[in-house]
């Protein structure tokens, strides 16, 4: 059994026919029967947007008549001068002689352990992390320690700590 639509005003309702009768029914079926040409054209136009309401792009009745983005370049000095700064945040930042201290990121438990494994503090730079990693790898490498198991474990811990810090974006 195959479904055949009942009609335009009966969405979700179907006749059940065998395949041959469905083909015959569909030959004579016209979704737009009874509609004028203008109604068919309107339906086809609305079908483009899935019969949802749309608005003309770029039209906003509430927008001020200022320059558009295409008329001003955001990177130009003029655009920065025209920028509204009602709370004075930008002017205060310009007035400061130096940059503010970067906010310290709160370390996760594993990140703190990784820094501890490398013998570093949370404020270590990328260069500090890499230098500590290289020194500890050389110191605890199995070839440098004659196969000492304790040193091998430390070697693995150093590698894991460095990889974790690398994945976390510290180096």
Curated annotation (Swiss-Prot):
SMART domains listed in its UniProt record: DnaJ (SM00271)
Source organism, top-level taxon: Bacteria
Pfam families for the chain: DnaJ
Skewed-composition ranges (Polar residues): 57-77
Span list, region Disordered: 56-83
J domain mapped to chain residues: 113-170
PROSITE patterns: DNAJ_2
PANTHER family, A to Z: CO-CHAPERONE PROTEIN DJLA
Name recorded for this polypeptide: Uncharacterized 19.0 kDa protein in cobS 5'region
């Amino acid at each position: 059994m195959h479904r055949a639509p009942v009609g335009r005003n009966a969405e979700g309702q179907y006749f059940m026919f065998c395949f041959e009768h469905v083909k015959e029914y569909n030959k004579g079926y016209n979704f737009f029967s009874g509609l004028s040409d203008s109604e068919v054209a309107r339906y086809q136009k609305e079908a483009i947007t899935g019969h949802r309401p749309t608005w003309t792009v770029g039209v906003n009745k509430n927008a001020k008549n200022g320059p558009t983005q295409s008329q001003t370049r955001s990177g130009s000095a003029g655009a920065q001068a025209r920028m509204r700064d009602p709370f004075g945040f930008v002017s205060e930042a310009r007035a400061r002689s130096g940059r503010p201290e970067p906010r310290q990121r709160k370390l996760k438990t594993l990140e703190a352990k990784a820094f501890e494994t490398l013998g570093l503090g949370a404020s270590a730079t990328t260069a500090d992390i890499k230098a500590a990693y290289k020194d500890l790898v050389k110191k605890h490498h199995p070839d440098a320690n004659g196969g000492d198991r304790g040193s091998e474990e430390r070697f693995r811990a150093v590698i894991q700590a460095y990889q974790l810090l690398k994945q976390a974006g510290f180096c």
